[in-house]
Amino acid sequence: MKYIYIINGRADKAPKYKELFEQLKQNPHPYDLYTTMGEGDATRYVRVYCDLHPNEEVCFVACGGDGIINEVASGIVGFQDKQMAILFIGGSTADFLECYPGRDFRDVKAMLEGTTQSVDIIKVNDSYSINVCNFGFDSTVAAHANSLISNGVEPHKAFRRGVAYALLTSRFNRIRVEVDGQRIRHRLLLLCTLANGVQVGSEFRCAPYAKNDDGLIEVCYLRVMSLLRFLLTMNAYRKGEHLTHKFFKRKVIYRQAREVVVSSKDLFDICLDGEIIPGSLFNIKILPKAISLRLPTIKQQQP
């Protein structure tokens, strides 16, 4: 098995990869390094490599957080004999890794000694989401937080500021949602998450029951509610208790689905693993077990 480590080419990320290079020296194995040249380049590189080497067994290692994880996963969809792995080195957030508590995603040796699992991915028009796609209040939070993070604000602080901004600007969203052909009949929504993973925004457990290998999208639709009610329930949403919390009663619509259609007369943003995509019509479906993911060994307990 050949390994290709894909690292972010941004200058501010370079110091964070010293740990990776040291681990590679300590764990000799056949590998190449690829440094991305910009947003979307990891997906392009992986697809081109797979096209040129259709029969080669290779594992693409996404070195970073949710952004590069999404790009590598998007690149290997549809190719045989290709795996991906994740090293959370050099990234800002890694919500997708919350699906695997106890796994050591910072250790090269643990990755090399790991096992593979086939996981689902969500297709959104011609793009993909391996963790969570969301719109309404959530995508406004993400767009504002992304802007702050790019200016050096810590992710947790950025997302909390994003929440404050969205409270003022994005609590009433006229977006139509159809789940497996059935329309959710409410004129306005607060937010909606379509989840393969369990967490979004660094701390919000939007889909506590999600399993990323069951062939289903977890649909959580929150109806419009008063500002006071939303503020009172924010902590429950953060903890993943919104599906059972009394203050969310009659405000949450929860479904499991294979296909979802989202549309509006106006342009709106949908967020795919942190990437913001504008549009007015999104056809969304689950691709079961489309990705072969190498999982690292479980962290050793300290005596």
Map each language-model feature to its residues:
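Short solvent-exposed loop/turn micro-motifs enriched in small/polar/acidic residues
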Residues: 54-55, 113-116, 168-170, 185, ...
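A residue-level signal for conserved active-site and pocket-lining positions in enzyme catalytic cores
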Residues: 122, 141, 192, 219, ...
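ATP/nucleoside-binding phosphotransfer catalytic cores, i.e., glycine-rich phosphate-binding loops
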Residues: 179-181, 186, 211, 221-303
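Short, acidic/polar N-cap/turn motifs at the starts of alpha helices
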Residues: 117-121, 172-174, 189, 207, ...
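Short, glycine/serine-rich, charged loops/turns that create anion-binding
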Residues: 10-11, 91, 196-199, 224
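Small-residue-rich beta-alpha loop regions that form the catalytic core of phosphotransfer
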Residues: 2-153
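Generic preference for hydrophobic
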Residues: 5, 33, 177, 219-221
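ATP/pyrophosphate-binding catalytic subdomain of soluble kinases
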Residues: 125, 129-216
